[in-house]
Amino acid sequence: MEADLSGFNIDAPRWDQRTFLGRVKHFLNITDPRTVFVSERELDWAKVMVEKSRMGVVPPGTQVEQLLYAKKLYDSAFHPDTGEKMNVIGRMSFQLPGGMIITGFMLQFYRTMPAVIFWQWVNQSFNALVNYTNRNAASPTSVRQMALSYFTATTTAVATAVGMNMLTKKAPPLVGRWVPFAAVAAANCVNIPMMRQQELIKGICVKDRNENEIGHSRRAAAIGITQVVISRITMSAPGMILLPVIMERLEKLHFMQKVKVLHAPLQVMLSGCFLIFMVPVACGLFPQKCELPVSYLEPKLQDTIKAKYGELEPYVYFNKGL
């Protein structure tokens, strides 16, 4: 039996995005790491199906389940602002496989300076690509800005890790294991604002409820970027804080001392166990489509909105990025 799709809106959220649980379910769906292995052909099919559904011309015999699956693939692989296919490594669905490997090795190889520098560099290279891929595409980023952001974040991460390693030499071993997290958190506070500095300088695009562009707001940009920084730190925090405690205890066991070669793979696997939950939880902390009271915007932009809408538009909306 053919499904009636006349009233189906493919862009309507399946879960209430005003609630934390609804957002977590949404991101659990689109950050599914299995979508990383979907073929280019299937991704292109998903984009065609989504675009046809928006125009109301889906092929006969199409089922709702097919459209929902197409939307899942589309959201996982295509940028929400431009509709362009994102590079695989930069997608949020790659956070689990990519993040678990890097996190596991950062936590394992934290004792020697060359290893600390190398893995912090690898992590910041990965973060820079993720930040660029998931930026608000309405605010263009130059090659110079990307290079400066990458250099600054990498320098910050390495300097933090090296400095704290030196300061914690006489501290309990567990404290030294937490150094990678401190470096990651510090770098996130630098990398994301630097990568998106144009939004802080010129403002982020804000729209009305009907997706009509109103103007650009620096205050909205500051809020969106702050939320992204908090989300990224939250994503890595549980694994990078609790895993050192777990490994500190496990490594004292007799059988673990005999299989030191398995310590790194074990940390990678355990990092994955944390990230499989923390990626959607961290992404869902704040709505991706942010709502901001007009009264919080810059006075000049407030005047523009009041002149155009009167008091009928109490809020503006913008994509904060991921």
UniProtKB/Swiss-Prot annotation:
Record protein name field = Sideroflexin-2
What is its subcellular localisation?
Mitochondrion inner membrane; Mitochondrion outer membrane
Lineage, opening ranks: Eukaryota, Metazoa, Chordata, Craniata, Vertebrata
Q: What does this protein do?
A: Mitochondrial amino-acid transporter that mediates transport of serine into mitochondria. Involved in mitochondrial iron homeostasis by regulating heme biosynthesis.
Matching Pfam families: SFXNs (PF03820)
Q: Which UniProt keywords apply?
A: Acetylation, Amino-acid transport, Membrane, Mitochondrion, Mitochondrion inner membrane, Mitochondrion outer membrane, Transmembrane, Transmembrane helix, Transport
**TM region(s), chain numbering:** 100-122, 142-164, 174-192, 228-250, 265-287
N-acetylmethionine modified-residue sites: 1
Q: Does the keyword Mitochondrion apply?
A: yes
As for membrane topology, the entry says:
Multi-pass membrane protein
Q: Which GO MF terms does the UniProt record name?
A: monoatomic ion transmembrane transporter activity; transmembrane transporter activity
What family, per the record?
A: Belongs to the sideroflexin family.
Annotated disulfide bonds: none
**InterPro entries the record matches:** Mtc
Q: What are the recorded Gene Ontology BP terms?
A: mitochondrial transmembrane transport; serine import into mitochondrion
Database matches in PANTHER family:
SIDEROFLEXIN, SIDEROFLEXIN-2
* Coiled-coil blocks: none
Reported tissue expression: Widely expressed, highest levels in kidney, liver, and pancreas.
One GO location term (cellular component): mitochondrion
The answer to whether the entry has keyword Transport is: yes
Catalytic reactions on record? L-serine(in) = L-serine(out)
